[in-house]
Amino acid sequence: MPSAFSVSRFPVSIPAVITQTDWTEPWLVGLAGFHVLCLLLTCFSSQRYRLQVGHFLCLVTLVYCAEYINEVAAMNWRLFSKHQYFDSRGMFISLVFSAPLLLNALVIVVLWVRKTLVVMTDLRSLREQRRARARPKEE
C-alpha cells in the first residue's frame, strides 16, 4: 500500500498532512523537541542581543536550506522513517520544519521592534527633559 505522502498522492490540504502523519516516529519526536528548544532559546535570549542575532541567523539559514534537506530526506527516508513524507513540492518539510522556525524568527523580529520602540520612547523622554532643563536658564 503506498504511503499517503507519496508524490503522486500527496494531500493538498494542511489538515490532511497533519492527520496522516505518524507523530510517534522517533525523528518527528526529536524534531518537535528541537523546535521546543528553539522556542526556549528565543524566549531566554531576549536579554542577550548577540545570542539572539546568532539564533535568528541560524533559524533563517535552516529555513533557507529546507529545500536541500527535503531532497536529501526524500532520497534517504528509509534510513530514518516508516513512511515517505518528503514530496517534490516540499509541503511536509514546510509544515513541520520551516513553519516553526519562521514563527521563532517572527517572535525575534517582534521583540526587536518592541525594543526599538522602547529605546525611541526613552530617547524622546530624555530630549524633553533636556529641553525642560534648558528653558529655565534662558528665562
Curated annotation (Swiss-Prot):
Residues 116-139 form a coiled coil. Its main location: cytoplasm. GO terms for molecular function: DNA binding. One of its GO terms (biological process) is cell migration. Residues 113-139 are annotated as: DNA-binding. It is a multi-pass membrane protein. The keyword Metal-binding does not apply. Residues 47-52, 113-139 are nuclear. It is found in: Cytoplasm; Nucleus membrane. A motif (Nuclear localization signal) lies at residues 130-138. Keywords: Coiled coil, Cytoplasm, DNA-binding, Membrane, Nucleus, Transcription, Transmembrane, Transmembrane helix. The chain crosses the membrane at residues 26-46, 53-73, 92-112. Transcription repressor. Sequence-specific ssDNA and dsDNA binding protein, with preference for GCT end CTG repeats. Cell migration modulator which enhances the glioma-specific migration ability of neural stem cells (NSC) and neural precursor cells (NPC). Forms homooligomers, independently of the DNA-binding domain. This is Transmembrane protein 18. It comes from Bos taurus (Bovine). The gene is TMEM18.
